[in-house]
Amino acid sequence: MIKCAEDFGIDWVTVMSDPWAEASAFGIQVEYPEDTLPVDTGGHLPDATAASVMEHYNPLKNSRCLNRLKEIEIFRKQAGDRFFIVGWVEGPVAEYVDLRKATNASVDFLMEPDIVEKAMDTIVECAMSFIHLQIKAGAHCIGIGDSFCSQIGPDLYFRFAFERQKKLVELIHSENVMAKLHICGNTESILEGMIKTGVDIIDIDHMVPSMDRFAASLASHQVFSGKSDPITVIQNGERSTIIQSVRSDFIAAKGRCIVSAGCEITPETTIENMKNFKSSVFELQKL
């Protein structure tokens, strides 16, 4: 990660992606094939009631969580203050989905919401402990990944996620570091809520049509991050396409935007296009 940041002029280093770390600490069995996505293979909770009474995990006794803490310590030791160090936790909705699987979780949200909320409170309490340890290890910022929120609509977002995300953000701020919120997919219907959590950096997925009408809602300490399409623009686009995408997003955000992909950049992206993405930043100076 440090080498990548050095080669391509990236301003931060991050412990993502390992979104299954906390799930494995809760007991989910996860396999990590070489050069592809992790696969959850067992250990899922049988029902919402089981989720609501699950025990808190100890990050210091789980290998994936310990790896994250060690990564941050290495970043701090080797990169010092050259790069912005971003730690990570899963948000309540995403983590619940990991524990129950997507279809089961979706039914739970509709049929047993009160029981689901008990489980999510446990998830948040565990995340708070993990956040504290990551900050102690040297993180400048903690990202919160709550990907499935884009699939549940505004009503359920505000019931399950908003206050809990806000609680995590407030904890992060109380320890004098920044907070970042990432929700995959088209978050247009919940974007005002994401902003109101008070988080410092709001990731914008490429599926969000535009940041234009939301820019005025940002507080003075807030910025967007995004949202060039990882496939059609960054992986497959010509240099001019990449520059135009970055320019359009920057203008739409009224200049309140970190230049970033609108979700994860693919392994198939060429070095040339990564360099084009980097150079697109300097084109903004011409605006």
Describe the predicted segments one by one:
Residues 1-27:
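Glycine-rich, N-terminal phosphate-binding loop and its surrounding beta-alpha-beta segment
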Residues 4, 11, 36-37, 57-287:
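Active-site loop segments of alpha/beta catalytic cores
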Residues 19-60, 81-82:
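A contiguous, low-structure linker/loop signature
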